[in-house]
A protein has these predicted regions:
Chain A
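A short amphipathic helical element positioned immediately N-terminal to and/or at the very start
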Residues: 19-21, 63-71, 345-354
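Short alpha-helical segment that forms part of, or immediately flanks, the ligand-binding pocket
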Residues: 191-192, 462-463
């Protein structure tokens, strides 16, 4: 500490630039900042740029002809169109269902809200393709509903219609949580004021409530769109001939070893994703009238008229029961010998999972277990560096992490394979590269949660620590990090769930040594071992639920005594 | 030993437009004598908080140097300055108990364990916090939280103690009590202190010197008594409580007194001290409302414009031949309350009347 004061002797200070002083005042923290920023650039920005480069550069250098050639191929345009169509359709439907659920849960006297809430969140904590599996089981050629119940012999479950159904249900929780948060944070006095001015329920809804939640509705639609574009598992399993960019890029890469086309398709995915993301960040977010603090305001007027509540409740229960049906089907099938053909109950599939498949299960848990704390602590640290310390070069960190979040997993996965396949960064086939992908892909949620929380922590609490003689680094670990605990837990839960259930990026990275449960499930489905796949899915959902419950318990037991 | 000197300190905030293009503090010179408490007083945006934060080390001056006890600290980081600070929001660490809060800074000193314990318990005793030592700060009252904040700030035996509007979160009664408590402890410990507030009565009650600031510049640096009764500028006069600044003319001059005419009457005659006046010269007189009273034989005549009943007194806003004049009548129960539109005869207690220096800018240097 005294060293620092000697290093920059007194006197006229105008000469030494302000940003240099920031570094000198806390060299440790700047060191951390430099390492974090460099890591983000290498593991987030570099792979994406590698893919972009591969899309336009061949052996002959910058190759417009090769680019033009790929662009004339019909599968490029078809898959781009398919992706956009699917994304837009799913976004609209998922947002609508999310709104219905959120409105019913916050503004009506619908019975069984806790049940509806719990089930509506299920899809968020399970692998994205559990739904696809369930749909195949229920509506496939030998489907429980199509064949057993309805006797249809040649049902075609594969294609656009199934994808829309699955994605809409799978992404409803995103819209539901988003819109619910905003509905809850609207000051109920606004709706009361409208009523007191003589407005009917409908007028209040359409002129006050709806305009106030419009930003949340738009933002939900954009987020679902991004998720749909990124989704790999569902289109892969159930798309049939309806190929999206993610699937097409994968099959070009892995099926035809066509790196150039694969890179171009993955690059194309960036366009809708980044556009939607930027619109969300710089347009929708700025139009928000309400700050979502997560703190519900006073009780709002509940709509109790049967004419409104009954149809809404029926709709909600239909959605929730559909979700529940899908999950129960998967569990049922995991205990069925040969679904649709031999429906005797058995635990054979679980036996398979715990013997032959045990390795992949422990792999997944181990790698996700490593990635989770790294993601969460790094997220808090980055939030702190960005919100509290504006080091020179902060923008690199900010944009690096945003890019990794907005970029679909496919481009990240392809980028990793292409970037880290030669020294000095020869990482392909290692566990490290899988963990890196998990961390990078899930970092942003922790950063957002951490930043929001930091902005609510009085800055003078940290300043007090400094006046008492603590360095920036010590202040972060002893004062800031403990105060960020809620955000830390949000980030831990999210990172764990996502790391365990991710597919789109890691499918390019797994190796014989390090295979993951999600990849295994996919290959089980492809080889029609539906029962084993269902057993894996059930275990995965159970593990995630158990770990989340454990974390919740830990959080509440370590909360400050009142 | 820990005298604080600001020499020629300026602070520019880049990208801030408006008043003097982001110049928050403009060539400020200030000395805080060892063991004294100096208050920076002024409206928001006057640069007082920036000045305090520069002494703490949160802001770095754009120009100039700051020394504490002869050591140049201009480029020393906050955590190496050995300053204690009491924050407006108290900034108590919410995840620690009262004792842990107080211990935090002492732990960083690497003292022997028993000495650390001794220091903490003696400070807790001084602040009457022993019974609350193991509570969370959120379970304490505002006044108790304030004491914890002070305990935490002084336990490391800082060279300088900084107060950033520490009482503004308390209700009026508690504020006065804590104010006296803060001052008593500061005097007892003899710590050189800088105190920032926008409350003039707080400033007068607590300080050895009051520094009134405006637009990043010191308007006056003086004892509380002088700042109140001999303001250097109209701004200071009006900022330090209510003041009538009446336009007058020098009517009569002799060796020791000067008589001032306000509008049509010679309103008062007061000792001239050693100041120079010219007959007929225009002057501005600071007359505090408490020094004007209703008097049937008074020289001045004023028309009542507004009457505000305050309990202990009645506040009148009157029109004194075209000039606004406010005064307080605490005798109303004897004389009755006048009504709007009524004419009153007033007299001025001439002893405390203060004639503002002619040229504020020229006089400012003298005052400082």
């Amino acid at each position: 500490m005294t060293l620092v004061s000697q290093a920059t002797p007194s006197g006229r200070t105008g000469a030494s630039p302000a940003f240099l002083r920031k570094i000198v005042v806390d060299p440790w923290l700047f060191g951390i900042f430099a390492v974090v920023t460099l890591s983000v650039l290498v593991f987030a920005a570099l792979p994406i740029f590698t893919v972009l480069k591969q899309a336009v550069v061949t052996d002959r250098g910058f190759d417009l002809a090769a680019l033009a050639e790929v662009l004339t191929k019909s599968f490029v345009w078809e898959s781009l169109f398919n992706t956009l169509l699917l994304g837009a359709t799913s976004a609209v439907i998922a947002t609508l269902t999310g709104f219905v659920l959120a409105f019913s849960a916050t503004r009506t006297t619908m019975p069984g809200k806790t049940f509806v809430h719990g089930v509506a969140l299920l899809p968020i904590i399970s692998p994205p393709f559990v739904m696809a599996l369930a749909v195949v089981i229920l509506f496939g050629r030998s489907g429980l509903i199509t064949r057993e119940l309805l006797g249809i012999r040649n049902a075609n479950v594969y294609g656009f219609h199934s994808l829309v159904l699955i994605q809409s249900l799978a992404f409803t929780p995103i819209a539901y949580l988003n819109i619910r948060g905003m509905l809850q944070s609207i000051d109920s006095a606004l709706e009361d004021a409208s009523a007191s001015l003589g407005a009917s329920r409908w007028i209040t809804f359409s002129r006050v409530t709806l305009p106030l939640v419009t930003p949340a509705i738009l933002s939900s639609a954009l987020l679902v769109f991004v998720k749909s574009v990124e989704d790999f598992g569902n289109p892969m399993l159930i798309g049939g001939n309806f190929n999206t960019l993610a699937v097409e890029a994968y099959s070009q890469m892995v099926g035809y070893f066509d790196l150039h086309s694969g890179a171009l398709l993955a690059s194309l995915m960036l366009v809708p994703s980044i556009t939607a993301f930027l619109v969300h960040r710089y347009w929708v977010a700025k139009r928000s009238y309400v700050t979502v603090t997560g703190k519900p305001t006073a009780q709002t007027i509940r709509i109790s008229g049967a004419a409104v509540v009954l149809p809404l409740s029926m709709l909600c229960y239909a959605i929730v029961l559909a979700i529940l049906l899908f999950y129960l089907t998967v569990i049922y099938v995991s205990f069925t010998r040969l679904p649709g053909i031999d429906n005797t109950l058995t635990t054979d599939h679980y036996a398979t999972v715990f013997t032959a498949g045990f390795q992949t299960l422990t792999n997944s848990l181990l790698l996700a277990g490593i990635a989770t704390p790294v993601t969460a602590v790094a997220g808090m640290l980055i939030a702190y560096l960005l919100v509290r310390k504006a080091f020179p070069g902060s923008f690199l960190l900010r944009w690096g992490t945003l890019l990794s979040f907005a970029a679909p997993g496919t481009i990240l996965g392809i980028g990793y394979v292409s970037t880290f396949n030669a020294p000095p960064l020869l990482l392909t086939g290692t566990a490290f590269i899988v963990v890196a992908a998990m961390v990078v892909k899930n970092l942003q949620v922790g950063i957002e949660a951490g930043s929001n929380q930091l902005r609510q922590i009085d800055k003078s609490i940290e300043e007090a620590s400094m006046t008492l003689g603590a360095s920036n680094t010590r202040t972060f670990f002893q004062i800031t990090l403990p105060l960020l605990k809620p955000a830390l837990f949000t980030s831990l839960s999210y990172a764990f769930t996502r790391s365990l259930t991710t597919l789109s990026a890691v499918i390019f990275l797994v190796s014989a040594n390090w295979t993951l449960i999600t990849v295994t499930i996919l290959s089980q489905v492809e080889t029609l071992k539906i029962g084993v796949a269902a057993a894996y899915c059930s275990i995965l959902v159970f593990v995630v639920l158990a770990i989340l419950a454990l974390m919740q318990l830990l959080l509440s037991s370590t909360s400050p005594k009142r | 030993m820990s005298k604080v000197i600001f020499s020629n300190i300026s602070k520019r905030f880049p990208g801030v437009s408006g008043a003097a293009a982001g110049l928050a503090v403009d060539r400020l010179n200030l000395v805080i004598e060892e063991g004294t408490l100096v208050t920076l007083l002024g409206p928001s945006g006057c640069g007082k908080t920036t000045t305090l934060r520069m002494l703490a080390g949160f802001e770095t001056p754009s120009e100039g140097a700051i020394t504490i006890g002869g050591r140049d600290v201009t480029n020393v980081p906050v955590n190496a300055r050995n300053v204690g600070m009491v924050f407006q929001s108290y900034a108590l660490f919410p995840h620690m108990t009262v004792r842990e809060n107080v211990e935090y800074g002492v732990r960083l000193l690497n003292l022997p364990r028993h000495e650390m314990k001794d220091r903490v318990s003696s400070v807790l005793a001084t602040m009457a916090l022993e019974t609350y030592a193991d509570r969370s700060p959120s379970r304490l009252s505002g006044g108790q939280q304030q004491r914890v904040a002070l305990a935490r700030a002084v336990v490391t035996q800082p060279k300088v103690l900084l107060f950033d509007e520490p009482l503004s979160n308390l209700d009026a009664q508690l504020r006065e009590r804590m104010r006296d408590e803060l001052r008593a402890i500061q005097l007892r410990l003899g710590i050189t202190s800088l105190y920032v507030t926008h409350d003039q009565s707080e400033a007068m009650a607590i300080s050895d010197r009051v520094v009134v600031m405006r637009n990043g510049v010191i308007e006056q640096d003086d004892t509380p008594l002088n700042v109140y009764s001999r303001p250097g500028t109209g701004f200071v006069a009006e900022f330090m409580g209510k003041a009538n600044i009446l336009q007058g003319r020098v009517e009569k001059l002799d060796e020791s007194t000067v008589s001032i005419r306000i509008a049509s009457t010679v309103a008062f005659t007061l000792p001239r001290g050693n100041r120079a006046f010219r007959p007929g010269e225009q002057v501005r007189c600071v007359v505090r409302p408490e020094h004007i009273r209703v008097d049937a034989n008074g020289a001045m005549q004023a028309k009542v414009r507004r009457v505000v009943f305050q309990g202990a007194y009645v506040e009148y806003l009157t029109d004194l031949e075209g000039q606004e004049c406010v005064f307080l009548d605490s005798d109303y129960y004897r004389t009755g309350v006048a009504e709007v539109g009524q004419m009153l005869r007033l007299s001025v207690d001439s002893q405390p009347v203060w004639i503002l220096p002619h040229n504020e800018a020229a006089d400012m240097g003298k005052a400082a």
